[in-house]
């Protein structure tokens, strides 16, 4: 019988079906993404979050291991509780919404995480300030790559003449 490949080796390499990556590199990638990510386990305890300076909501290491319901304000608790109940039961897999916050457009999504056998592992959340993306869409502000390069070259030439 063939030995199962380890998912993490002594060099902190993570081995996935789709390739390998060093744990410090993956952590850096996750903290480079200009959005915030978080994870609550199957017991609804807050376990992990990205820490990249692009936060809409402040997160603190002291909240790790705490029940997620206690981390939400009273008005949101019933909705969070119902969503988690649906995630646990498998009747809902995701929930997403937009919200206006201090003049910014915030996109928030929650995903139920299941293993290959359907066992509930927890809830993954994604929060992002999409204000600039929305403005780009509204103004059709798209710069074709070649035009951007030509503009940069023109700017460099004009500085060379000064």
Regions found by a protein language model. Give the residues of each.
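Generic signal for short, ordered secondary-structure residues
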Residues: 5-12, 16, 22-23, 47, ...
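Short, contiguous hydrophobic alpha-helices characteristic of membrane insertion segments
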Residues: 14-16, 25-26, 67-75, 144-149
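Sensory modules in modular signal-transduction proteins
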Residues: 11-45, 49-51
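Sensory/regulatory domains in signal-transduction proteins
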Residues: 41-47, 51-138
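Intrinsically disordered, low-complexity segments enriched in polar/charged residues with Gly/Pro
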Residues: 23-27, 33-34, 83-86, 97-101, ...
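Short low-complexity stretches enriched in small and charged residues
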Residues: 2-4, 20-27, 63-65, 77-83
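Juxtadomain coupling helices with adjacent low-complexity linkers
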Residues: 2-7, 11-12, 19, 128-162
């Amino acid at each position: 019988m063939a030995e199962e490949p380890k998912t993490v080796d002594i060099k902190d390499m993570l081995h996935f079906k789709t390739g390998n990556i060093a744990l410090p590199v993956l952590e850096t990638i996750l903290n480079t993404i200009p959005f915030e990510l978080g994870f609550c386990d199957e017991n609804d305890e807050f376990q992990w979050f990205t820490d990249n300076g692009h936060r809409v909501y402040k997160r603190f290491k002291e909240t790790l291991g705490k029940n997620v319901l206690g981390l939400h304000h009273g008005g949101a608790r019933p909705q969070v509780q119902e969503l988690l109940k649906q995630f646990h039961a498998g009747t809902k897999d995701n929930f997403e919404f937009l919200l206006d916050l201090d003049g910014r457009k915030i996109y928030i999504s929650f995903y139920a995480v299941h293993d290959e056998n359907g066992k509930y592992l927890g809830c993954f959340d994604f929060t992002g300030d999409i204000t600039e993306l929305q403005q780009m869409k509204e103004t059709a502000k798209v710069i074709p790559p070649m035009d951007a390069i030509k503009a940069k070259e023109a700017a460099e030439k004009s500085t060379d003449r000064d």
